From Swiss-Prot:
Ranges for region Disordered: 376-406
Signal sequence coordinates: none
Family per record: Belongs to the GcvT family. CAF17/IBA57 subfamily.
Annotated GO biological process: iron-sulfur cluster assembly
Domain of life: Eukaryota
Keywords from the named record: Mitochondrion, Transit peptide
Cellular component annotations (GO), alphabetically ordered: mitochondrial matrix
Protein name, as recorded: Iron-sulfur cluster assembly factor IBA57 homolog, mitochondrial
Native source organism of the sequence: Candida albicans (strain SC5314 / ATCC MYA-2876)
Gene Ontology MF terms: transferase activity
Localization of this protein: Mitochondrion matrix
Annotated Polar residues bias: 386-404
Major subcellular location class: mitochondrion
Amino acid sequence: MRFPNVGLAELSKSIIKIRGPDATKFLNGLVTSRLLPNVVKKKQHTISESENRHSNLSEIIDVSKNYGLMHEDIYDPDYNINISRDGINSMILNSKGRVVTDCFLYPDPFHNVDWVFQESMNEPGYLLEVDTSISQQLMMILKLHKLSAKVDIVPDKKLYSYYYYDDTATFDAWLENIQFKYFKSLDPTTALQNANSFIKDNVFFNQQIAKNILGFAVDNRIPNFGIKFISNKPISTNNDNDGQQDVIPVESLFSESFSQEFDTPTINESGVVQRRFQNGLFEIQDASKGSSLLPFECNLDYTNGLSLDKGCYVGQELTIRTFNNGVIRKRIFPVQFFQLTEYNISYLQDHPIDLNMSDPVVENLSNIPNSSLGKLEITPLDDSEPQQQQPPTNESPFASSPFGSSKVVRKRKTSLGKIVSVKDNLGLVMLAVSDVEKCQIYKLELPSFEGGTQFIGVKVGIPDWWPVN
């Protein structure tokens, strides 16, 4: 049994509104993405010709206005920077460079068709989307850093986050096309015009509900992975509408042209989560509470959430130093847990990881508390070193020798990886990159309630969307 190939799901996210004259500067000092137009380099000669093309960004972007967002990719050899009104993926770190939360950041509003959001366009405004489990802690952090900044920070429980995806080649091509047409502008004026055209052309949304769409983003954490949007009304199916006036019927959400070309079923959020796990896309709520993770361990550089030249922000020093050193030792990899049989081992050697909710290992793993997952030992599949026996010493009636013993010596085991999260027979595991390059099949030791231990297999997947080193 797999997750659905297509669907629309509501996400368990909280939305925080950040608005005011200093909103752009305030957020730029907290998130790992660049919001200000200046390029920061310690040495002028390190600015490449490609980067020099954007030296006039400060003339194009007025940060005191609601200009949208900059989009950049640190792995783009042409160093393209686009200005548009769709959202971006980012992270917020603590002072030690550890991840507080990942997030999506949207310009507020996305569009201004028929001047419906004209009042909001008068000053910088953003929607910060985070997992509901972290929202209260994040509010405390934001207020702590506010100081004298002229910003209003308000959680808005009347905003709703949704996710749509379609795992067909047709949708992938469609998504590529609309990005090229509507979200590759080079200045704020064109960015707003393109966003308005996206609504007026009935590309995705039905224009009749345009006043309800506050945020929009193409999820490019994985290229063309899906669409995210924020509405000011909940979306309902025919079954649960019950004549409510304060909802958007799902059949009224999508444009006629989109509905004719693509399926639009509603699904549970669990389908979105399973799809993330299979593709190796980590989110901070996947980890147990209190986990201490670095942004590169979470693959932030691979998911378009990092700017290298934006200047100072909280946690920047360790992050940039790690990148400049060029060595990232550990990353979170997607894995599949399986029963250790010769057939399974042989099959998975040549096949990608895959969701199987009926696999017996699902029950085995469900008996392990989340707090204990990280303590389980992952070792090489052929790790069967014999016990070492010390040479016997001469027996003495008086005392045992302090220099030797016939006692069996067990070599201390060292786990090669740490389980971050488990979903059915899939998981996310922290592993050394060098170990995965050598081997992708491991075994996991589980405690047995019947006494002793049991082992299950672990197949590590290397996502095909990761950049080639």
